[in-house]
UniProtKB/Swiss-Prot annotation:
Belongs to the PheA/TfdB FAD monooxygenase family. Gene3D superfamilies: 3.40.30.20, D-Amino Acid Oxidase, subunit A, domain 2, FAD/NAD(P)-binding domain. Induction: Expression is under the control of the terrein cluster-specific transcription factor terR. Its cofactor is FAD. It comes from Aspergillus terreus (strain NIH 2624 / FGSC A1156). FAD binds at residues 6-35, 44, 137, 239-241, 282, 303, 319. It comes from the Eukaryota. Terrein shows anticancer activity on various tumors including cervical carcinoma, ovarian cancer, and head and neck cancer. The secondary metabolite acts as angiogenesis inhibitors through the inhibition of angiogenin secretion. Terrein also has anti-inflammatory activity. It shows an alleviative function of age-related inflammation characterized as an anti-oxidant and might therefore be a useful nutraceutical compound for anti-aging. Terrein may enhance osseointegration by decreasing the level of ROS and has a potentially synergistic effect on osteoblast differentiation. This is FAD-dependent monooxygenase terD.
Length: 614
């Protein structure tokens, strides 16, 4: 006897939990099968890049994360001391961990167990979603004949629970079961890549040391080897990554070897380990799956489809973004808002990201090894590896902010007028600019108006509506958008609020106190919610604030207020299209490529049929 689910997620890794949170946000139930007996208690990953923190913020989770995590503000670079007798190290340079202006969020450190626990809590808050522990997935198959039927359950998942076989049928399946993915192996997919001869040890320790930068992230490259230190949350524990001697077998490494190698690199500073929380050893390698999906019904995420060295803090972060990418797309299809072709964009977008990551990690890992100099690494005037330059140049990449999704049905750079908003790059995530909310003078970041709640956004930048030309532009666009043939009503789910699928956000320029509410067309103050009240929280202005200065959002986004601009933003905060204010049909043409008109939904949900935004 089998059980049927809209989505079965194999493994409760970071990618799977992020996707499940999206599904919960849309009101879609899923089944999460985890082989462990309970939640992760000790996690290997710890670095949380700024894009990941932005994603936390979009789900309303950032406050807790920022309170508990260790804020990684500065990086110190240490190298061999040429004046010392024998081996020794000296600080060469200090730099910011994140370039100012890259993001309004910091890079932070928090263990993966707590990181994942926050996602578990977020799922529960939304629809009570839980993880089924003690289920070891053994086999996944896809009936490709059924896969073309949107109402079918073509995926079969077999799992073992307490010695008993359990069978689940699903419309869709996500593999979030790690580098040794049972799902990937069942589908006959292979990991392609290589493993180098370089072996590293890692340990989370409570150090007694006179090393002055022990509470900073440090990159140390000495004649004795290389080390990366990462201060952990709580103020005492430190993670130490250390390069081990050539020819080391990772499976034979002992804790004593890791500690001895660390002491040699730290010399002349002392390193006495008071306690060890966790330790491991691993060879450096980069591998990527030869396929990321099967029949548009099974999708690989996280370590199930890409593995690499952990020293740049990418694994957990890229996995999170895999889940963040596929989750809302699955929910959109299951809710009947978009056709299944939307899911094809997951592979198009995330496989490219994985390819870039793997190639970049090969260079990064080589630079960190002591043999890099021999292979033409970045060197300073003395022939030493100048890793600080490598690190600084890679900041935007490691922060997760250089991801650019290529053209597809939901990302249309080719049909955009990029000159209308030169810094709103199509395919990239929307950068945060400071604005003022019109109704109450609250200072906000633009991204705070775009939470991860499943809605598409049409962001309108009309300019200063005290000018007749700008006022006319805004009124004409509003009339079109909310008309019966405009995109807002065309795709609106029956009985839903006018802003439940596509929300319109207006960002004015000019002086707030000289603009009256009745100068803004009524269409932009929709009546919504249980009490059918006017929503006054959709209008913002680029103006001086009482305490935070002027955000200059128009300048930041490269928008001429005399001409205005429109940006269409995806539910995951990536920019889909940029248009000029008069291109009304261009907005409709965008949504026509993938949204389902009322009454044209593909299939139906097994769980919730009504549209909900938890």
């Amino acid at each position: 006897m089998s059980s049927k689910f809209d989505v079965v997620i194999c493994g409760s890794g970071t990618a799977g939990l992020a996707a499940a949170t999206w599904l919960a946000q849309y009101g879609v139930d899923c089944k999460i099968l985890e082989s462990r007996s309970g939640p992760l208690d000790v996690g290997q990953a710890d670095g949380i890049q700024v894009r990941s923190v932005e994603i936390f913020e979009s789900f309303g989770m950032a406050e807790e994360l920022l309170r508990e995590a260790y804020h990684n503000i500065e990086v110190a670079f240490w190298g061999s001391n040429p004046t010392s007798s024998g081996m020794g190290i000296v600080r060469k340079r200090s730099a910011h961990a994140t370039t100012p202006g890259l993001s309004h969020m910091p890079r932070v450190i928090l263990n993966q167990a707590r990181f994942n626990e926050m996602w578990l809590e977020a799922m529960r808050r939304r629809n009570g979603q839980e993880v089924d522990y003690g289920h070891k997935v053994t086999k996944v198959t896809v009936d490709e004949e059924k896969a073309t039927d949107p109402d079918a359950y073509p995926v079969t998942i077999v799992a073992q629970k307490d010695g008993q076989e359990q069978v689940f049928e699903a419309k869709y399946c996500l593999a979030s079961d790690g580098a040794h993915s049972a799902v990937r192996k069942s589908l006959g997919f292979n990991m392609v890549g290589e493993t180098s001869d370089s072996v590293w040890g890692v340990m989370d320790v409570f150090p007694r040391t006179n090393f002055p930068d022990i509470r900073k992230q440090c990159i140390i490259q000495s004649d004795a080897g290389s080390i990366i230190t990462i201060p952990r949350e709580g103020g005492s524990m430190v993670r130490v990554y250390v390069e081990l001697a050539a020819g080391t077998n990772a499976k034979e490494v002992t804790l004593e070897q890791i500690q001895n190698a660390s002491r040699q690199v730290f010399h002349p500073y002392a390193l006495d380990v008071a306690d060890v929380w966790w330790w491991s050893a691993y060879p450096i390698g980069q591998r990527i799956a030869d396929h990321f999906s099967k029949a548009n019904r099974v999708f690989l995420t996280g370590d199930a489809c890409h593995t690499h060295s952990p020293k740049a803090g990418q694994g957990m972060n890229v996995s999170l973004q895999d889940g963040y990418n596929i989750g809302w797309k699955l929910a959109s299809v299951l809710k009947g808002h978009a056709g299944p072709e939307l899911l094809e964009t997951y592979v198009l977008e995330r496989q490219k990201v994985a390819d870039v990551l793997i190639n970049w990690d090969k260079v990064w890992a080589k630079q960190m090894c002591s043999i890099a100099k021999e292979d033409g690494g970045v060197v300073d005037a003395n022939g030493k590896i100048d890793f600080s330059e490598v690190f600084v140049k890679a900041e935007a990449f490691t922060a997760g902010l250089t991801v650019t999704y290529g053209d597809s049905i939901i990302t249309q750079a080719g049909d955009s007028n990029q000159q209308a908003a030169t810094n709103l790059k199509v395919g990239m995530r929307l950068p945060a600019a400071q604005v003022v909310r019109f109704c109450d003078a609250k200072v906000m970041k633009t991204v705070n108006a775009l939470p991860s709640d499943g809605r598409w956004r049409i962001m309108i930048f009309p300019g200063d509506i005290r000018q007749p030309s700008a006022s006319t532009r805004l009124a004409q666009l509003g009339t079109y958008l909310f008309s019966n043939h405009g995109p807002i009503r065309k795709y609106l789910p029956p009985g839903a609020d006018i802003d439940s699928l596509i929300e319109v956000i207006v960002i004015l320029s000019g002086e707030r106190l000289e603009i009256q509410q009745d100068q803004i067309p009524d269409a932009f103050w929709p009546t919504t919610g249980k009490y059918r009240m006017r929503d006054l929280h959709k209008i913002y202005i680029d103006d001086e604030t009482y305490h935070n200065g002027h955000g200059h959002a128009y300048d930041f986004y490269g928008i001429d207020p005399e001409r205005g601009a429109v940006a269409i933003v995806r539910p995951d905060q990536y920019i889909s299209k940029v248009l000029d204010m008069k291109n009304h049909e261009g907005i409709s043409a965008f949504f026509e490529k993938f949204l389902q008109k009322k009454g044209q939904a593909n299939g139906s949900l097994n769980s919730h049929d009504e549209w909900t935004l938890a």
